[in-house]
Amino acid sequence: MLRFLNRCSRGRGAWLLLAFTALALELTALYFQHVMLLKPCVLCIYQRSALWGVFAAGIVGAIAPSSLLRYPAIALWIYSSYEGIRLAWKHTDILLNPSPFTTCDFFVSFPSWLPLDKWLPAIFNATGDCSERQWSFLSMEMPQWLLGIFAAYLLIAVLVLIAQPFRSKRRDLFSR
């Protein structure tokens, strides 16, 4: 399995599949926001940012998958997945254990050098409350689904990182 993951990480298709899945989740979030009129909260916006990090990792990895550029892509993939898990866990905790002392911020706080909420307010502007239950599917809220998705991303990313030293075997049918 590790040799297979190594081979996949050296091909462009797997990286583009990673980027496609993250983009599909982003488009789903925008559908929920603009078509179903669900209001995203601050933690939802941060989780979207983590998904954009996974998307960026897929694009960086697809640029030159056979070179050493895949290592920064794997690092970005692991970091974004970990942050997504951390944020989804915090959001799930706020939803499942409501408390007046555990709340999220009122406004998104991006770095001053990257004010995404000012540049793209249709995507990164938070208008909802983190403790409000807006959507559920199969008795799970959206942050719980994202917790599972980010955990799957992280598991696969760690396995791909572990697989990097395992080269695929050369198959020489006519040698001894």
From Swiss-Prot:
Keywords from the UniProt entry: Cell inner membrane, Cell membrane, Chaperone, Disulfide bond, Electron transport, Membrane, Oxidoreductase, Redox-active center, Transmembrane, Transmembrane helix, Transport
Predominant location category: membrane
Periplasmic side: 32-49, 90-144
Signal sequence interval, chain numbering: none
UniProt keyword Thylakoid, yes or no: no
Disulfide partners: 41-44, 104-130
Record-annotated membrane-spanning stretches: 15-31, 50-65, 72-89, 145-163
The protein's name: Disulfide bond formation protein B
Organism: Pectobacterium atrosepticum (strain SCRI 1043 / ATCC BAA-672)
UniProt gene name: dsbB
